[in-house]
Amino acid sequence: MESFHTRFSAWTPFSNKSLNRQLFQERVALISHWFDLWTNKQRQEFLFAIFLRCTKSQLRFVQDWFSERMQVAKVDFSTVLPRFISLYIFSFLSPKDLCAAAQVSWPWKFLTEQDCLWMPKCVKFGWFLPYTPTDNEYGAWKRHYIACVSHLDWLTPREAAATYGTLNEPKTEDEELLERQREKCLRKRIWEKIALRKKELFKVRPPWVSGTCCSSVLKPRCQPRLSQTVRERVGLHEALEKQLVLTSLETLPKRSNISGSHSYPLLSKKNWHGVHKNDDRSSYALRPHFMLISSRIPAYEMVMESVKAGVVSVVYEHSVTLESLLYLIEKALDGQKAQSIGIFSDGDSREINLLQGYKIGVKNLLRPEVRDFWEKLGSYVATEEEGGHVDFFVPLGASEAGIEVLSQLSQLTGTFFTAPTGIATGSYQHILSDWLGSQWGKAPSSIYFCESKLQTWSSFTDFLEETLKTVRKQLYPFFKELQKSISGRMIGQFMFDTMGMTNILNNQDTAQALADGLMELSKEDSERNVVEDNSWDTKSRLSKNDLNFEALINLERILQKDSAEKRARVVRELLQSERKYVQILEIVRDVYVAPLKAALSSNRAILSAANIQIIFCDILQILSLNRQFLDNLRDRLQEWGPAHCVGEIVTKFGSQLNTYTNFFNNYPVILKTIEKCREMIPAFRTFLKRHDKTIVTKMLSLPELLLYPSRRFEEYLNLLYAVRLHTPAEHVDRGDLTTAIDQIKKYKGYIDQMKQNITMKDHLSDIQRIIWGCPTLSEVNRYLIRVQDVAQLHCCDEEISFSLRLYEHIHDLSLFLFNDALLVSSRGTSHTPFERTSKTTYQFIASVALHRLLIENIPDSKYVKNAFILQGPKYKWICATEIEDDKFLWLSVLRNAIKSSMEK
């Protein structure tokens, strides 16, 4: 019985441990069974009662047990929690934080791109997706949000006033009331036309109702003619058609990546990594220099290749619009601000020939679209306090009008504008002259360009452009798949490698030695040619002329001593350039005319007297006129002083320009006569071969020498503007200078118009020749604006909405946009065995007048991108460009061309 002795419990034996253990386990099992049968509340009460009975040591034991068993699990909550909880957590993040969270891991990226997170953020701003994503597609709303945010329009004060009415400027009339009145007048006119048409049709009764009782009442006293009725109907139709065309233009997107109208590009890596960075100091330190290059610049590929590494450069076509040019700049800068912007385009000392139809000058600088362009351009460059500046590679600093343009642009944008003074004459030599207001201790050209390459380009611009026309034609088939900027740089590098002129420019001693050697060789060749021809001694004639020019050279040195007087420097440049020009004309007389006349007088005629008269009569008269002008300048400048005048001499010269008019009128006949004589007279061919492109002729041929009269007037105009710029307002010469400038400017416009007409005619002939079945394109004032290659699509079912339509590619088209019509042609490609390049052929399809062309944009969807509709009176084309930029640029240019054609 001793073994069953108990203590503190009637059920637990004290001394028998095995029995004690057995009984304890049975009772624990019994309590556990009861615990399992209890409810949750009963279990909680039981645990509470047990813990109240426990001592501190027992409670500490429970705490230690929980701390050992309950270890903290370091796992990603998005992989453990249900998806709806994770999405609920992510819904509290901002769009910027969601983009940053997407870079953490793939589960986070998948969750943060769900449409349920991004759709409310888009709908909040009214950015609706143009199509419904499929079940297995995600991220569409995120891409839509990013596209809308990254391409938000920055409104200038003028645009904000037009949109929201926030610009407090006095208005002459209520715009809304004016628009309402205009619509009312249009509706009234349409209804009047319709009523008149019904009335006229009612009066013109058919013959079978002439015997009715009411025929005598309805029969008018004067029957209207059928042509009158037709004219009324045509007038009504034209008014409605014009309104319809204008409405279609207004519905086109005016910005790239507008919500629901364009594709939604993914963020670039730079933007992804920069989501959480917002350091203005770092962005200021990394601001790039930006260079804008016009395709109108001769040999622009070599200018592209001259751009320094690290400078962002863009080549734009001269035919684009201001809106398209801003888009190209915005895309190239990619949200950054440029430290400086350089604009390398065509122009003169008064205006910038920035785009086709936009010569920026004092007269049109404040036009709304031009002003908005410069305001937005100024927002892309750093402020003047931060060292930002805009550099025009156009000699605006050489005239009062150009300086006024720079001043107005600075006031308009708050940015510093600078340009070369243009003292150095010649083809684009002004970029090497002094710059107006340069504050950086060096010319702005050294900021953007490798100066040795740029100097090479500027020295041989005219020759390089002629050469590059052939190079482009030969290399384009190989580079047509590349971007234009890349292919342009490759062609420019090819030209520099072929020329090999950079090392010569860097080594002046070598260049001088080479020039001396070539001069000695030319003297020997000239003497040998004289012996063979037994004709005119060219060298002796030139040596006599050198005596006359020694006095001019001494006079130039005297004027050069007064370097502080800017007016004297410009006059010296006028005298020096005129001397060089007369030398060029005397080369024609001494090298070509004199030997031909000597051969004719010695009964060994190379050309007949009639042909010599046709080819050289006008150029010799020009030589006589300019020789007299040079003598007058020399006599006036023998004792030059601040009070002396040159305007009177130039005015007298400008009143005798009929000599030049005769030359330009006969210019085509002169060139054709040279070509005919070269082909038909072997002796003349040999004569030209012996004298063309020698050192005596400055490596020029006879047709190239005849180009100089047309180019001289641009130099006259720039120099006269520079003289007037540095002439005080009270000076006696100022009035004569203004008269002379007007004379030269008017005559230069006449030359430019002739040149433009010939160029347009040749260009239209080339297009007509390459398009099979093309009608006659040559018309007055017609010119080509742009050529765009597109794919023609066919819609399988036009009854469904745009977002669900399926398209198939059926043809390749080329669209030739003229200023008055659109020519549509099919484009075919043919390959030759064993050849990599292909041949492109064009087949005429149709032409549509621009004022009858309707345009409709097709929003991007999963099935089609960059598409639009062109519809004429008889045809309809669904077109698509290969890239988004081409569509935006094409629609912008087309819209501008249609508006211009309807305003005529």
Curated annotation (Swiss-Prot):
Domain F-box: 75-121
The organism's place on the tree of life at top rank: Eukaryota
Pfam family, one: RhoGEF
Keyword Ribonucleoprotein listed: no
Keywords associated with the record: Guanine-nucleotide releasing factor
SMART domains documented for this protein: RhoGEF
This protein's record includes keyword Transport: no
Entry coiled-coil feature ranges: none
Function in brief: May act as a guanine nucleotide exchange factor (GEF).
Protein name: Epithelial cell-transforming sequence 2 oncogene-like
Lineage: Eukaryota, Metazoa, Chordata, Craniata, Vertebrata
